[in-house]
């Protein structure tokens, strides 16, 4: 197809007229479409319905270490749930805390805790004149909503094909002690579907922050969300890299089963260094006696182990893959060669991002 920039004004006006007519035809159909991003379909939710049968009134709800999951206790989760999520997050079990149903909730609490009580003895952020966060863009709007909610100044960092602009990240983090963190979705990122390169992860692990309480908020939400068995992105494990680089405490790693089992009814986890986890437990001991152990046990008995999760995710992929391929086929057929936008073909996650030309975003959304 001929690029729009190579068409004459008359040709563009004629094209515009035809496209507007097509647009009116579609509008006249009165379609009611759920355009929510990252929301699993009913077919995907049905994949986990067997979980509802794993715990019945006649089932023993005692977990492996003898704790009765119906009762109080177990501040940081039952052992088998910690093992399941640890394997999914590629970290040792002892470096994991299991929380409730939402990793976003855990991230919110982590920022709130830093605001009110500081991190590992540092000054609470609320007592500082200025607190700043790096925000790779485009990124996850709910991450940015958290920092905005707490009045934290957000600094945009452009995304590249290999992750955030690390030259910019390194320069800012090393020179400004007011910068306390960065949001990251390192694998099949929201919304572009980019996975951080080896070099990007190495550079993150070797950051030299001016702030001793700087933390990388590593939201690995799509760690097992591949579309293909034979074509999968690989992401280096950040916790070990930080430890090898002499920065063991610099990262908080988050994940959950929200897009594996039931969104809103899954289990969430954080992985971090021993020192970070003990700092977090000091607040948790006041905040809660423990999270929902019955739900943790239900997940463990349904999936069994990491291999069960892997097999389960293949079923998700079978449902999602045709949808991704359809969108990509239509984009290429209708817009390929026109030079009016760009996109990538992700190997996993939930998103395809269309990057329009400068100045076009508002007009596109307005339609």
Regions found by a protein language model. Name each.
Residues 67-212, 223-246, 320:
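Conserved core of the PLP fold type I
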Residues 99, 240-321, 333-334:
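Conserved core segment of the aminotransferase class I/II
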Residues 2-76, 80, 86-87:
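N-terminal "arm"/small-domain region of PLP-dependent enzymes with the aminotransferase-like
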Residues 314-328, 340-356, 362-365:
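Conserved glycine-rich beta-strand-loop-beta hairpin in the small C-terminal domain of fold type I
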Residues 41-46, 105-107, 143, 190-193, ...:
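Short catalytic/ligand-binding loop motif for oxyanion handling, primarily in non-cytosolic enzymes
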Residues 181, 215-216, 252:
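Hydrophobic "anchor" residues on beta-strands that sit immediately upstream
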Residues 219:
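Glycine-centered flexible beta-alpha turn that most often forms the glycine-rich phosphate-binding loop
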Residues 16-27, 276-277, 281, 287, ...:
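Conserved C-terminal alpha-helix-loop-beta "cap" of PLP-dependent enzymes
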